[in-house]
Amino acid sequence: MNFNFSRFQYISNIFFILIISFPGGLIYLLTGSTLSFWLRESGFDKITIGLFSLVNFIHIFKFLWGPLLEKVSFAPLSKRGYKYCLIIALVSCICCVYILTNFNPNTHFIPFALCLVAVAFFSSIYDMLLQSSQMLLITNKNWGISEAACTTGFRIGILIAGSGALYLSTIISWQDVYRSMAILCIPSLLLIIIYPLKFKDKTIINDFDRFWYAFYDFIKKPKWLIIVSFMLLYRLQDNFLSIMPNMFYLDIGYTKKDLALGYKAFGMCAAILGGFIGGFLCRKYEYFYLLKRALIYHALSSLSFLFLYFYNRDITSLYIAVFFQEFTKGLTMSPFFSYQLRCCSSKYCITQIALITSIAYISTILFGSISGYAATYLGWTYFFLVAGFCFIPAYILIKYLPPYVIPS
C-alpha cells in the first residue's frame, strides 16, 4: 500500500491548527466571560463589568500593525519568522496573564486593567497569525474543514477557561485559577516550537517591500463596502448579548457549579458540534444559504432565555436552552469565518485578515460595552427581545454580497 504523503501533511496541518487554536480561545475568555465572574465576586456592578469589555478595543486596531507583522513573519526569515512571531506572541500572552494575577481588581484597579489590555494586545497578534495559518497551510477547498478544526480548538480553550475556570474558582482563588490557565497554554507553545511548517504557496513569503498594497488590493474587490458592513453586523446578536448571559443565569438562581457544567461545558460541546456540522455543510451548500439559515436559527435561540425567565428554571431546562443557543452559534461561525478567508488575497493574508477581523471587533467592543447598560435599563425581557432582532441587518446584506471572492 502506497503512503499518501500529501494526505498525511493535510491531516497533520489540520491537527496543528486545532492545537494552536486552543490558547486563542482560552486567553479570549480570560479577558471576557470568565473575567466577568471574577469582577462580579469582587463587587462590581453590571454596568462596570460591561465596560470592562473595552479592554479588547486593541483588536480593532490590529490591522495597523498587520503589515509590519507580515513583513517580519515572512521576510527574510520565511517559515522561521512566522514561527518566531507565533512563539513571541504566545509567550507574551502567558507572561501577561501571570503578571495579572499579582493584582487585585479592587485595590489595584489601574495596573489590573493595563495588564488586561496587554493580554488583549498580544492576543490580537496571536489571533492574526492563527487565522492566516489556514491560508498558508490549507488549500481553499478545505477551508471549511480547517475552520471547523480551528473553531474546535478555540472552543476547547473556551471550555477550559469557562467551565474549568468556573469550577476551579469554587476551590481556589481567582488569581490561582488564572495562573493555572496560563500554564495550560504551554503544550501548544511546545508544538509550535517543534512542528515543521510547510506552506502550500512559497510565493507567500517573498517580496513584501510594498506591503501597504494589501489595503489597496482589498478595496479593489467587488462590493468591498458591503463586505465591510457585513463583517461589522454579522455577529451583532452575540455582541449585543456579550457577557450578560452570565449575569442573567446568576440572577435567576443558578449556581456557579450549575453554569460550569450546564452553560460552559455542555454549551461548548454543543458549539463544537455546531461548528463541525457547519464546516462540513460548507462543502455541500453555498455560503449564503448557510449564512442565512444559521442567522435565523441563532436569532430564535434568544427565545430560550425568555423560556427560562418566565417558565422553568430547572437544570434540564438550562441544558435544553444552552444547547439551542450554543449549537446555533457554532453553526453560524464556520461559514462566516470561511467566507472571511475567501475575501482575502493569499499574498496579503495576515494584513487583510487583520483588517476584516478588526472591523468585526468594532461591533464586539461597541455593543459589548453597552450591554450592561442595556440589561440594566431595559430589563431582561426586552434585552433578549432586542437581541433576537439583531440578525436583520446582516440578513439583508447577504443578498448584496459578492458570491465568491477567491483569493489571488
Swiss-Prot record:
Highest taxon listed in the record's lineage: Bacteria
Membrane topology: Multi-pass membrane protein
Parts of the chain that traverse the membrane: 10-30, 49-69, 84-104, 109-129, 154-174, 177-197, 224-244, 261-281, 294-311, 315-337, 353-373, 378-398
Compartments where found: Cell inner membrane
Classification via Pfam families: MFS_1
GO cellular component: plasma membrane
GO molecular function: transmembrane transporter activity
Keyword 4Fe-4S set for record: no
Keyword set, alphabetical order: Cell inner membrane, Cell membrane, Membrane, Transmembrane, Transmembrane helix, Transport
Principal location class: membrane
Entry annotated with the keyword Transferase: no
Family of this protein: Belongs to the major facilitator superfamily.
Protein name: Putative transporter AmpG 2
